[in-house]
Amino acid sequence: MAAAGRAARPLVAGGRQLRVPLRWRGQVAAAAPSTKPQAEPETRKPKTGILMLNMGGPERLDDVHDFLLRLFLDRDLMTLPAQNKLAPFIAKRRTPRIQEQYSRIGGGSPIKKWTAVQGEGMVKLLDSMSPQTAPHKYYIGFRYVHPLTEEAIEEMEDDGIERAIAFTQYPQYSCSTTGSSLNAIYRYYNKKGKKPKMKWSIIDRWPTHPLLIQCFADHIQKELDLFPPDKRKDVVILFSAHSLPMSVVNRGDPYPQEVGATVQRVMEKLNHSNPYRLVWQSKVGPMPWLVPQTDETIKGLCQRGKKNMLLVPIAFTSDHIETLYELDIEYAQVLANECGVENIRRAESLNGNPLFSKALADLVCSHIQSNEICSKQLTLCCPLCVNPVCRETKAFFTNQQL
């Protein structure tokens, strides 16, 4: 996978050679290493459960519709008029187009496989780093595909977990992502009308963790080294993150600031070797979102003579459709060819990097040692919050007793 990520193939555009990353989309899902059992399997009942929270992605084309339906029904993510009726209509209408995109990257999302690889590496390290809370077991809790967050909680309860850690896999907090996953945990218990058997705490954000920053910097430097030597210092690094509607930002969502903090630390680690910008991708609909947009930035740089670029997915830790299709195909191939880019590459996602598993283990170990329920930031609602469930969720977690 790493070797394939470093290779490039030329495209000829207007007499110029356009170099784009060569990553075989058709083999992406299969490229994730399988989760292997430990040499000496753990036979004791797990004591500490780490619930790895993320949105997930459809593994098969047949899963796309249900994925979209759950997504458009999520009122923590978006509010639509007559949502229960409109969401099924939108999901049905968009399914063929999204299925086509997934077919271009191998027929499904590899995010579950990469999460399993990361979780496996994390718990192996944790058992030696924190023997007093061992054995540790990771669980995957997705919002929009199986295993759903609620299904993971049931498995944790059935396993007799004593200490449960809700660990967001979004380094930067947003009410639309991490907040939605935490609300799902609260709703699970509220709907059943029972108190948790497990003692819950949360790792709700980690935008500047040193090992996370080191991983990003290492992946960026690897790609920079593959640009022509005479172009290398002029390469513009475009840190691309999923955008957010300005209506959410204006309520006080901390996501833009936390993404910016990650970018700043990464550039400090790189000694500010190159010019850079933070840009935003995946805007949907006509309403205002964060700007500048990734695609518009690529066009604008080309028009101004800056034609060597490195795309960095800074808010994603695993490959999924927004890296493999939107960045790799829509931007690094189609758009770059149209607007005359000379060299464009994409930094590999963190995926199976052993240092990233170490980062996850360090985050959990430090969290356990802190004996804190959550970060101070989580206790503060957005100043103009309009979602009462957020306040109920925060109260649910802050009232936990470790």
Curated annotation (Swiss-Prot):
It is an enzyme of class 4 (lyase). [2Fe-2S] cluster binds at residues 175, 382, 385, 390. Its EC number is 4.98.1.1. The active site is at 209, 362. Residues 1-33 form a transit peptide. InterPro entries: Ferrochelatase (IPR001015), Ferrochelatase_AS (IPR019772), Ferrochelatase_C (IPR033644), Ferrochelatase_N (IPR033659). Pfam families: Ferrochelatase. Keywords: 2Fe-2S, Heme biosynthesis, Iron, Iron-sulfur, Lyase, Membrane, Metal-binding, Mitochondrion, Mitochondrion inner membrane, Porphyrin biosynthesis, Transit peptide. It is a peripheral membrane protein. One of its GO terms (molecular function) is 2 iron, 2 sulfur cluster binding. Pathway: Porphyrin-containing compound metabolism; protoheme biosynthesis; protoheme from protoporphyrin-IX: step 1/1. One of its GO terms (cellular component) is mitochondrion. Its cofactor is [2Fe-2S] cluster. Coiled coil: none annotated. GO terms for biological process: heme biosynthetic process. It is found in: Mitochondrion inner membrane. It catalyses: heme b + 2 H(+) = protoporphyrin IX + Fe(2+). Protoporphyrin IX binds at residues 94, 102, 109. The keyword Lyase applies. Catalyzes the ferrous insertion into protoporphyrin IX. NCBIfam families: hemH. Belongs to the ferrochelatase family. Homodimer. Homotetramer. This is Ferrochelatase, mitochondrial. The lineage of its organism: Eukaryota, Metazoa, Chordata, Craniata, Vertebrata.
